[in-house]
A protein has these predicted regions:
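Subtilisin-like serine protease catalytic core
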Residues: 18, 36-38, 56-57, 135, ...
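Hydrolase catalytic cores
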Residues: 271-277, 302, 405-470
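Short acidic, glycine-rich surface-loop motifs adjacent to enzyme active sites
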Residues: 296-325, 349
Length: 581
């Protein structure tokens, strides 16, 4: 039988006189007492430093992180400190020496300067005697708490931010997904032409089955990795788990199939990380989740969405308690906060543990001070009974924000046109908020995670009176976007080619098209039908750097959805527009 453990190696130097048992954490030492001679344990081995050969990485930053990651970090870090010690790889010499003592490597963590893997008690004691080994600790494992289903008849109405919008003619036919989107004013933002274009989102879940589903037909997936099995296939097909949960969360944030389901950020780019083995009683192993987050950072993601939330461990492991929800105890919380410091907007489910009058019911890493903890409301705006509550042990308000998580309309993995509204949980509300964040970042890519957090809080339904049931309330994406559009400086030279928006949208018969270029450029804008077939050129001119606009006349066009594609020498951007006569 294998048991899970984590060997931890930090940057602090080790004295020669330190006892090897001093390097073994109390939790691991207790596990040693319950372990047989040949029983393998899953542990982290943490190192004292990263060795001497580190200068090369600071001189050539792209050897450890992508250009996109460096650009994102420039929003929050000084130019001379875009690469940190935590970006440097774990010392390969150290790894090989540990392997020579019998250690079987599972994951590597450059942020925590350690490796996880399997070894016996005696092998671990031998490893602890190495001078450059700092600490050995267990790898924590988590269960997932699923929401208790509620009555679908929802008479509880706390807020309706768009009372007339359900009868409005929108740019797209949202089908049954309109209600969950309308609650957080997503259709109004789509009507402005924003779809999440240019934003990269990392989805971390238990796998993503049936990516051939019709709702993913136009999704741009740029990278995938299975951190459970160590391969790029994130669809399960019976491979250590069931990926139906990931299918649903991915459809909620970025699916697109008119008349059925549209996600907030269907125009974004996605990377998919499988981090959970649902065939296990404790499917979430923290080393997989941390490795996925580091991978996402190195690629250059802007937003992460994950439904991880702790619960009690199986014996002989100890679990976290509500008293550990202080933002500084759980390793996954520490990792999530570090990601935010690197410029990533980290969105996490608050948890499905409901209300307790005596203490919080949060799950790590939602307790992080920089992590956006998302709770759940019903379609009428009332808090879902299963939605976890704060405050954190150190007194901070949690959750941060709310969106619908009760009976959302999602894609399912039974067949390629399968949809369902039977599920509930903060796993559903989390991708709704993450998708809204992507829309806002499309409007202003220079927003830092904390600026984006404050913007969402300040425009939410309880912005002036937050509490530990709803946080700052149900997000109002349109209000957040409008607050940015009213403060845009048209004299600022843009950093990238962007079609900002068309307004009004839908239109009849004319609409204003606005775009921007960073340098003098030859710009062509071409009208296509919804299938991508070219219809006519509507703009072609040499323009100076800055903001430009023109009026598109649709008098000769039929009602429907069209694509506008802007082309320059090296860049192309596309938006959807809707003509309603």
């Amino acid at each position: 039988m294998r048991v899970l453990i984590f060997s931890f190696i930090t940057f602090i130097s080790i004295s020669f006189g330190q006892s090897s048992m001093d390097k073994v954490t109390h939790q691991l030492d207790r596990l040693f007492d319950q372990t047989g001679p040949g029983e393998e344990l899953l542990v982290w081995v943490f190192f004292a430093d990263k060795g001497d050969a580190t200068r090369q990485y600071f001189e050539k930053p792209t050897t450890v992180v992508s250009e996109k990651s460096l650009k994102r970090r420039a929003k929050v870090l000084s130019e001379d400190k875009l690469v940190l010690q935590t970006d440097l790889p774990v010392n390969q010499f150290y790894i090989e020496k540990v392997q020579a003592l019998g250690f079987k490597v599972k994951q590597k963590s450059k942020w925590f300067n350690g490796i996880s893997g399997w070894a016996t008690k005696q092998e671990l004691l031998n490893i602890s005697q190495l001078q450059y080994v700092k600490e050995l600790d267990i790898v924590y494992k988590f269960k997932k708490e699923y929401a208790v289903e509620e009555d679908k008849e929802d008479n509880q109405t706390k807020i309706n931010q768009n009372p007339n919008n359900l009868n409005k003619i929108n740019s797209f036919n949202y089908g049954p997904s309109l209600t969950q989107l309308n609650l957080i004013t997503i259709p109004d933002v789509h009507d402005l032409g924003y779809t999440g274009a240019g934003v990269t989102i990392c989805m971390m879940d238990a796998g993503f089955d049936l990516l051939s589903h019709q709702v993913f037909g136009s999704m741009n997936i740029i990278a995938t990795w299975d951190f459970v099995n160590g391969d790029p296939n994130v669809e399960n097909h019976g491979d250590l788990g069931n990926g139906s949960h990931g299918t649903s969360t991915l459809s909620l944030i970025g699916g697109f199939y008119e008349g059925q389901l549209i996600g907030p950020a269907f125009g974004a780019d996605f990377i998919l990380a499988k981090t959970e083995n649902t065939e296990s009683e404790t499917p979430v192993e923290e080393d997989n989740w941390i490795a996925a987050l580091e991978w996402a950072d190195s690629i250059g993601v802007d937003v992460t969405s994950t439904s991880l939330s702790y619960t009690d461990f199986d014996p002989p492991y100890q679990g976290y308690t509500w008293q550990d929800m202080d933002g500084n105890t759980a390793r996954i919380t520490i990792g999530a906060d570090l990601a935010v410091k690197l410029g990533i907007f980290v969105v996490n489910s608050a948890g499905n543990y409901g209300y307790d009058p005596n203490h919080n019911t949060l799950g790590a890493p939602a307790d992080g001070d920089s992590v956006i903890a998302v709770g759940s409301v019903t379609s009428g705006g009332g808090r879902s009974s299963f939605s976890s509550v704060g405050p954190t042990v150190d007194g901070r308000i949690k959750p941060d924000l709310m969106a619908q998580g009760s009976y959302n309309y999602v894609a399912c993995n039974w067949f390629t046109s399968c949809y369902s509204d039977n599920g509930s949980g903060t796993s559903w509300s989390c991708p709704m908020v993450a998708g809204a964040a992507a829309l806002i970042l499309e409007v202003d890519p220079n927003l830092t995670p904390m600026e984006l957090r404050d913007l969402l809080r300040n425009t939410a339904s309880q912005s002036t009176n937050p509490d530990n049931l709803y946080g700052w309330g149900i997000i109002n994406t349109y209000a957040a976007v409008q607050s940015l559009l009213t403060t845009v400086d048209d004299n600022v030279v843009p950093e990238d080619f962007v079609i900002l928006r068309n307004y009004p949208n839908p239109f009849n018969p004319t609409t204003k098209i606005q775009f921007e270029v960073p340098v003098q450029s030859d710009v062509r804008i071409i009208l296509h039908d919804v299938l991508g077939r070219e219809m006519k050129e509507v703009f072609h001119n040499e323009v100076k750097a800055g903001m430009h606009e023109f009026i598109l006349d649709g008098s000769e066009l039929s009602s429907g959805v069209y694509l506008l594609r802007m082309l320059t020498e090296n860049i192309q951007k596309t938006i959807k527009i809707s003509l309603l006569k």
